[in-house]
Curated annotation (Swiss-Prot):
EC numbers, comma separated: 4.2.3.5
Organism: Bacteroides thetaiotaomicron (strain ATCC 29148 / DSM 2079 / JCM 5827 / CCUG 10774 / NCTC 10582 / VPI-5482 / E50)
Name of the protein in question: Chorismate synthase
Binding site for NADP(+): 47
Comment on bound cofactor: Reduced FMN (FMNH(2)).
Origin: domain of life: Bacteria
GO BP terms, alphabetized: amino acid biosynthetic process; aromatic amino acid family biosynthetic process; chorismate biosynthetic process
Coiled coil: none
Job of this protein: This reaction introduces a second double bond into the aromatic ring system.
Stated family: Belongs to the chorismate synthase family.
Species classification: Bacteria, Pseudomonadati, Bacteroidota, Bacteroidia, Bacteroidales
Length: 358
């Protein structure tokens, strides 16, 4: 029931970390869209494990195989089915997790809720599930590209190291020039050094991703319970390890007066615009035509390669030192996931908007 995301553009995902594969079925994708499978694969490659010394060493090709809904390079309007086969599972690395619960992981809650859990890499709770989101998000990006809408995310903070400027202060073309996916080369090196240091200690660290959506038309959003920022927040907080979401000035707005926070309108050659964009491109839950920007906070990954106190499945106190291949920081690989969830949300709400008037 809750393995599906979206209203009109709708993804249903399936698969587990150490199962045979991860895939999905997409309903509501418009017909006639040229499907650039190379682009879809490039998006998956940005999420793929083993892409740098900062990420998990698990080696997966993550080659997407489309099963339906595409004919002669174009979408047919029928459900698009796809799968990515798992090829490099090391399930024995998780044998020591079968009888114990990892602190702050989904192990305990899954077991209590369902009475059973897949301890191999976390099963369905693994971030490997996000493969399906990246594929669907890549297709959504292809559709949005025809509408002049672009979505870009980047790492803006790792631990205490953060970018002080806004997205407009940086050359976003530099994001893919470093392993951290940060548009500031100097800060990127500091962030990478910190992640590498933490990884060497067997620990993990969190941080923040910033995302900006450009070219979004006025009018996307469905008040009162379908506000665009609420939909984006729901999308982002469904991502593994995501802990907080803010858009526009967010919490910074607490320190501002209304006269400072308000985005004053003006007439720009017949087009109504605002001098500022503290609202983050959304007013009253509806896009106003300005850039939409938001931030997503990710916690440190729960699986540590150092000893921690925990309990076993019988409730007896014990200790755990995880084995296996794990990321020390989720942020570099989460960039395409955040973009994908944003793309799916915007396309879905664009299609929803077409139902409001005859």
């Amino acid at each position: 029931m809750f393995n599906s995301f979206g209203n009109i553009f709708r993804l249903t995902s399936f698969g587990e970390s150490h199962g045979k594969g991860v895939g999905g079925v997409i309903d509501g994708f418009p017909s006639g869209i040229t499907i650039d499978e190379e682009f879809v694969q490039q998006e998956l490659n940005r999420r793929r494990p083993g892409q740098s010394i900062l990420t998990t060493p698990r080696k997966e090709a993550d080659k997407v195989e489309f099963l339906s809904g595409i004919f002669e390079g174009k979408s047919t309007g029928c459900p698009i089915g796809f799968i990515v086969w798992n090829e490099n599972q090391h399930s024995n690395d998780y044998n020591n997790l079968k009888e114990v619960y990892r602190p702050s992981h989904a192990d305990y809650t899954y077991k209590v809720k369902y009475g059973i859990r897949d301890h191999r890499g976390g099963g369905r709770s693994s971030a490997r599930e996000t493969i399906s989101r990246v594929v669907a998000g890549a297709l959504a990006k292809l559709a949005l590209r025809q509408l002049g809408i672009s979505i870009t995310a980047y790492t803006s903070q790792v631990g205490a190291i953060k970018l002080e400027g806004t997205y407009s202060d940086y050359d976003l073309d530099l994001i893919e020039t470093n392993d951290v996916r940060c548009p500031d080369p100097e800060k990127a090196k500091e962030m990478a050094d910190l992640i590498y240091k933490v990884k060497g200690e067997g620990d993990t660290i969190g941080g923040t991703l910033t995302c900006v959506i450009k070219g979004c038309p006025i009018g996307l959003g469905q008040p009162v319970f379908g506000k665009l920022h609420a939909a984006l927040g729901n999308a982002m907080l469904s991502i593994n390890a995501a802990k907080a979401f803010e858009y526009g000035e967010g919490f910074k707005g607490l320190k501002m007066k209304g006269s400072e926070q308000n985005d004053v309108f003006f007439n720009n050659n017949g087009r109504i615009e605002t001098h500022t964009n503290h609202s983050g491109g959304i007013q009253g839950g509806i896009s106003n035509g300005q850039d939409i920007y938001f931030r997503v906070v990710f916690k440190p990954i729960a699986t540590l390669l150092m000893e921690q106190e925990t309990v076993n499945i019988d409730g007896v106190d014990t200790t755990l030192k995880a084995r296996g291949r794990h990321d020390a920081c989720v942020l570099p690989r989460a960039v395409p996931i955040v973009e994908a969830m944003a793309a799916m949300t915007i396309l879905d709400y664009y299609l929803l908007d077409k139902t409001t008037q005859l």
